[in-house]
Regions:
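Accessory, non-ATPase domains that flank or precede helicase/AAA+ motor cores in DNA-metabolism machines
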Residues: 1-235, 243, 252-255, 277, ...
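Conserved phosphate/pyrophosphate-binding and hydrolysis machinery centered on Walker-type P-loop NTPases
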Residues: 17-21, 107, 111, 175-178, ...
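Conserved RecA-like P-loop NTPase ATPase core
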Residues: 28, 145, 185, 261, ...
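Short, charged N-terminal beta->alpha structural module
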Residues: 112-123, 318-346
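Alpha-helical scaffold elements adjacent to nucleotide-binding pockets in ATP/GTP-utilizing enzyme cores
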Residues: 116, 120, 184, 210, ...
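Conserved helicase ATPase core of P-loop NTP-dependent helicases/translocases
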Residues: 127-140, 327, 337-361, 387
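Cys/His-rich short segments
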Residues: 240-335
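Conserved RecA-like P-loop NTPase helicase motor core
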Residues: 377-402
């Protein structure tokens, strides 16, 4: 491009900081066209929150010759592969296979997984950066590990891309534009002609139809990596404790073992019905279903209260239906005579002292290990009126199996 004669360009006196490389500027234009957003939106994600005056003198371009798991090495030799793995498989072997090729981008679904892998790679002698904390090291060419935003890590040119548990919904940006970190990472690999691998115990439809080969472990090893699942049909069984506890679950709960109960429903109970005639308790004015709290029927929507008296037969004996986390916790304490901890997404709990825990799916992120995990109403997950409810339900089983 020729310099216009009528314009005199000023000399650049100072560069305040380092920004994303030119490849990410081009990638931001591609992302804005695909997800109907602005280029500035994606460039903000790719830019460090603080001014970076200069990059450190570090490089991860030297390739490490490391012998790793056969499946991990084979997957990267394919240049692009989808690998179905068991939930209990260690991420380290795939991370080492990616890092041994040079400047690698490794995406993990949660910050805890990313930090754990970062520490393991550091101990193995790799030059690793944790995004976004180590943004300058990433821009200098270090192996970069991070969560969703790390798809925009400022690595100049990629030598390998690894996406762990690509089925996790945490890779999807919730606010518009709703971009997916997996798609961004694979586009970067395509542009840099770098081998890429995505792993998952339950690959998504996008992964299975992307045209890459599907690789799996030995069938016995894959089966051994999953927890044992018991499917209990409660339709024809008398409940041992309320409407949520089967005989099999009651036996597990009575043992001195650590049990986690998952129920994606808050509160004590959504519904109440007459124990004598089976009539559902409803508001006399609006007709809304009422729940039972002590000796009163209460609406969870507007707080309406009235005495617990059946409109049909005048009975005062009611039973709860559609119990929430609080209701199950109360009945669980009565059944086992042991303390129970409630955990929802609103609770800030770092450690749990009790062996019995009840909560929403957030409990699977707070509890690192358990002897048994019980989903008290899995039909609610399978039949939820939302897009891809079945895939999200499968993701819960994967998380629980770990």
């Amino acid at each position: 491009m020729e310099e216009p004669k009528e314009i005199t360009l000023s000399e650049i006196k100072k560069v305040s900081g380092v920004g994303p490389p030119a490849s990410l500027v081009s990638l931001a234009q591609w992302a804005s066209d695909r997800w109907l957003g602005t280029r500035a939106h994606f460039l903000r994600t790719a830019t460090h929150t603080r001014i970076v005056p200069a990059l450190p003198k570090t490089s991860a371009s030297d390739k490490h010759k490391v012998v790793t798991q056969t499946l991990a090495e084979e997957s990267f030799r394919r240049n692009g592969a989808v690998v179905r793995v068991a939930p209990s498989i260690d991420d380290f072997s795939f991370a080492v296979a990616a890092a041994s090729r040079g400047r690698a981008l490794i995406l993990a679904p949660t910050l805890a997984r990313a930090q754990h892998l970062y520490v393991a790679m550091k101990r193995a002698g790799f030059d690793v950066a944790l995004h976004p904390r180590d943004w300058p090291q990433s821009a200098a060419g270090s192996i970069t590990i991070g969560t969703r935003s790390a798809a925009w890590a400022p690595i100049p040119k990629l030598d390998a891309v690894l996406v762990l548990d690509e089925h996790e919904e945490s890779y999807q940006q919730e606010s518009a534009p709703t971009w997916n970190a997996r798609d961004v990472a694979l586009e970067r690999a395509r542009r840099d002609k770098a081998p890429w691998v995505i792993t998952s115990p339950s690959p998504s439809l996008e992964a299975l139809t992307c045209g890459a080969p599907l690789l799996t472990e030995d069938r016995r090893r894959e089966r051994d990596g999953w927890a044992i699942f018991d499917l209990i049909d409660l339709r024809d069984r008398p409940p041992s404790a309320g409407s949520w506890c089967s005989e099999e679950l009651a036996r597990v709960l009575r043992k001195e073992s650590r049990v986690v109960c998952v129920l994606n429903r808050k509160g004590r109970a959504r519904l109440a019905y007459c124990e004598q005639c089976g009539t559902l308790a409803r508001s006399e004015t609006s007709g809304k279903a009422l729940g039972l709290e002590g000796d009163e029927l209460v609406s969870a929507l507007d707080g309406e209260r009235r005495p617990a008296v059946c409109d049909a037969c005048s009975s005062r004996r009611f039973r709860r239906a559609k119990l929430g986390v609080s209701g199950v916790a109360e009945e669980l304490e009565l059944l086992t005579r042991r303390p129970v901890t409630e955990i929802t997404a609103d609770d800030e709990i770092d450690s749990v002292d009790t062996d019995l825990t009840v909560g929403t799916e957030a409990v699977l992120h707070r509890i690192s290990a358990a002897d048994a995990v019980a989903f008290l109403d899995f039909d609610q997950e399978l039949l939820a009126p939302r897009y891809r409810a079945a895939e999200e339900a499968m993701a819960l089983l994967v998380r629980a199996s770990r």
